[in-house]
Amino acid sequence: MDEATGETETQDFMNVESFSQLPFIRRPKDKNPKPIRVFGKDFTGRDFSITTGQEDYTDPYQTKNKEEEEEEDQTGDNSTDNNSISHNRRFECHYCFRNFPTSQALGGHQNAHKRERQLAKRGVSSYFYHPDNNPYSYRHYPSWTNGPLTAARSYGGFSSGPKPSGYYTRPSYGSQLGLWRLPPRVQGVYNSNAAFTSNGSSSSSNSTLPLLTRSQTQLSSQVGGSAAQNRMSSYGYGLSPNVQDHVSLDLHL
């Protein structure tokens, strides 16, 4: 069979000694070959299939690598943009409007502002609780050193003069012990044991009594005695007999 013309040739097969001597006969080509579907695409011829396969076929690994490279480029650009933004960003304080490079520094600074405001609120509340006191002094105890010391102020009496600002102040723990203070001892003026003398004998002026002795059992039984001495003896103190009481007090009931 001639491949070019498609005509058959007659040959003598009786004298053939081996299969290699037999001619190789091919099937004639179809004029309209059937298309071959590969990866969802139809291929009709060998040459066309090779060209279309090379043009249309894409390696999935190559596409994946290209996508990863594009993503890396995008992330790199985003990271550079974020770094530039972070370097240019400043954290501003809401209280004093100062700028800080990091959020941690801003947080510590604003915590200090909050602490200062809490202390200021406590000071204002204590000032309104004790309105007569100086706002810059310690507010829980009376300041007895603001004015001249008198016997009436020291021993709880009533004085005609102006009272100090700490006179109405009460201790924070609710006790009245903080209001009683001993005056500075003057030599020869106050006799610490005048209310407890017996048989005309008195102890030395250097001896001191407790801070607060308000015993009513130690009242003087002498009716005609000095009113000031009776009043002072009720608190455990008395004046020396040789010293006159120069404090002008109204002791009439």
From Swiss-Prot:
This is Zinc finger protein GIS. It is found in: Nucleus. Keywords: Developmental protein, Differentiation, Gibberellin signaling pathway, Metal-binding, Nucleus, Transcription, Transcription regulation, Zinc, Zinc-finger. Residues 11-21, 49-63, 76-85 have a biased composition (Polar residues). The keyword Cytoplasm does not apply. It comes from the Eukaryota. Residues 1-85 are annotated as: Disordered. Disruption phenotype: Reduced trichome production on cauline leaves, stem internodes and branches, and sepals. Probable transcription factor required for the initiation of inflorescence trichomes in response to gibberellin (GA). Mediates the induction of GL1 expression by GA in inflorescence organs and is antagonized in its action by the DELLA repressor GAI. Acts upstream of the trichome initiation regulators GL1 and GL3, and downstream of the GA signaling repressor SPINDLY (SPY). Does not play a significant role in the cytokinin response. Controls trichome branching through GA signaling. Acts downstream of the key regulator STICHEL (STI) in an endoreduplication-independent pathway. InterPro entries: GIS/GIS2/ZFP8 (IPR044291), Znf_C2H2_sf (IPR036236), Znf_C2H2_type (IPR013087). Plants over-expressing GIS have delayed shoot maturation and flowering, and a strong production of trichome on the inflorescence. Expressed in inflorescence meristems, floral meristems and stem epidermis. One of its GO terms (biological process) is regulation of DNA-templated transcription. Residues 1-10 have a biased composition (Acidic residues). One of its GO terms (molecular function) is zinc ion binding. A zinc finger (C2H2-type) spans 91-113. Induction: By gibberellin. GO terms for cellular component: nucleus.
